Amino acid sequence: MTPSISWGLLLLAGLFCLVPSFLAEDVQETDTSRRDSVPASHDTPYNLELSISLYRELGHKSTTSNIFFSQVSIATAFAMLSLGEKGDTHTQILEGLQFNLTQTSEADIHKAFQHLLQTLNRPDSELQLSTGNGSLLNNDLKLVEKFLEEAKNNYHSEVFSVNFAESEEAKKVINDFVEKGTQGKIAEAVKDPDEDTVFALANYILFKGKWKKPFDPKHTEEAEFHVDTVTTVKVPMMTLTGMLDVHHCSTLSSWVLLMDYLGNRTAVFLLPDDGKMQHLEQTLNKELISKFLLNRHRRLAQVHLPRLSLSGNYTLNTLMSHLGITRIFNNGADLSGITEENAPLKLSKAADKAVLTMDETGTEAAAATVLQAVPMSMPPILNFNKPFIFIIVEEHTQSPLFVGKVVDPTRK
């Protein structure tokens, strides 16, 4: 085996969020039980701070493009990878993922990932959320037993033997794994594995959620969306009127809307005041998001939200380097804890692919028309007809499942 073997990590986040059907809520409902069930954010390995850091790095690349990624997939894959790292490479990964190694032990980090993956994969009749990890190893190599055992126990990783010299065969194994896990939503996760690849790591997450309060398709109409000061596009705009979690945050100069799914998932939408998107992006922090989730502001309001179909496809090498994770991508990487063969490995490629669909489809809401007629005077109106940010969160752990920015909803 040659002394310079590249390890191709294919970090493939298959996120499919189907957002139909809000079941009607009684307007007298309170949020006490919901608030009491949310733990402190430090209990989660997928912290909000990392989501914001990743978002800002992607935002720096372009201010005119939609953004959509899964922090869950990115963090899971790199944390799992750290099981086979040693020395500075190992430390860089965990610190780059925003862990304070003086306060949290490595064992606790991996146990926290184990707990979160168990939480996310727990059967729930109200929504579908599943994740998966696959380790694909060249057929002439063997994984270190300790790495294999810890990856399986903490990250539920499946292991596949692949002949990477046959690129079509390797591509099919990887794509079949991701396509099956995402129920066909991501059919081609990878086009051509690098020719020197001997090990690949594939990760996916599938999420299908239904709104607690459904949008009535009868009220969806074509409307204008202002991409910028000179560009306007036509989009299908959904409308909902009722008791909603809505308030204006003066710190962010933005309106905040929280929309719950059936099950313990919540979407946080952030609509900046005119000209305040940059201020929102620079000021947003984990403390504010946590506060929004804990302190609800229910009021009568009307919301106009565009129907969405987004995707994100990113090469993570540069992105993660900006977070301080550099050694793993060069010849100084120490990944000797992965394979038994004494061959130097480095990470040749890391990629993230995510898909989102957000619409009003689903069960009919019998009380939707009644809610439309509730106000005696016009309620506050939130019109998401200009660029906005959204974060979908697992509430028990305050773990961000994915983050997005909508600049132009007509771009997929």
Swiss-Prot record:
**Cellular compartments annotated:** Secreted
The residues annotated as site (Reactive bond) are: M376, S377
Keyword Glycoprotein part of the UniProt annotation: yes
Q: Which Gene3D superfamilies match?
A: Alpha-1-antitrypsin, domain 1, Antithrombin, subunit I, domain 2, Serpins superfamily
Instruction: Cite the entry's keywords alphabetically.
Output: Glycoprotein, Phosphoprotein, Protease inhibitor, Secreted, Serine protease inhibitor, Signal
Chain positions with Phosphoserine modification: S33, S377
**InterPro entries for this protein:** Serpin_CS (IPR023795), Serpin_dom (IPR023796), Serpin_fam (IPR000215), Serpin_sf (IPR036186), Serpin_sf_1 (IPR042178), Serpin_sf_2 (IPR042185)
Major location category of this protein: secreted
The answer, when asked if Transferase is one of the entry's keywords, is no
Q: What is known of its domains?
A: The reactive center loop (RCL) extends out from the body of the protein and directs binding to the target protease. The protease cleaves the serpin at the reactive site within the RCL, establishing a covalent linkage between the carboxyl group of the serpin reactive site and the serine hydroxyl of the protease. The resulting inactive serpin-protease complex is highly stable.
Function summary? Inhibitor of serine proteases. Its primary target is elastase, but it also has a moderate affinity for plasmin and thrombin.
The family assignment reads: Belongs to the serpin family.
The protein here is known as Alpha-1-antiproteinase
Q: Which organism is it from?
A: Mus caroli (Ryukyu mouse)
